[in-house]
Amino acid sequence: MDAPAVPNLTAPRPTPAGRRDLSTLPKAHLHLHFTGAMRPSTMVDMARTQGVRLPPNLLHVDAASMPADGRGWFRFQRAYDSARHLVRSEAAMRRLIREAAEDDAAEGSVRMEIQADPTSYAPYVGGITPALEIIIDEARSASRDTGVDIGVIVAASRMKHPLDARTLARLAASFA
């Protein structure tokens, strides 16, 4: 399967004349969604490795030129779910966090807060506790290696039962 050309969305652009270079200012990246942090090139690589065909709209990186019939919450959610279903291992989970930290460091971030719902990855790593342990462990390691302070926010899906959220809140509290 030939991978489509995927632009590097994290490469700094040249600073226009007369403007200050914003890459030199410290930044904080808040409420970064775990799967949403995935590099397009990583998504293509994971899909290729797993033999998964990605929906064409998932690689449409210029939202402004996307046709109106390709937009909307439910279309977005289906595309997001397609990307999330590629994260099926501890190695994939660690890769997402590591790359997000590297990208944020390259952009001048000093703080990153990544939010993840461990139930999405639990089936592949032995449960919600191991899933959260992997996320926290890699966040610590990536923080040490990149210099970006990384916080982890445990998220709960509003589409699931409220008792699931209570379980996740208790799990998060046990790591606080």
Language-model-detected regions and their locations in the chain:
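Metal-cofactor-binding active-site regions of metalloenzymes
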Residues: 2-176
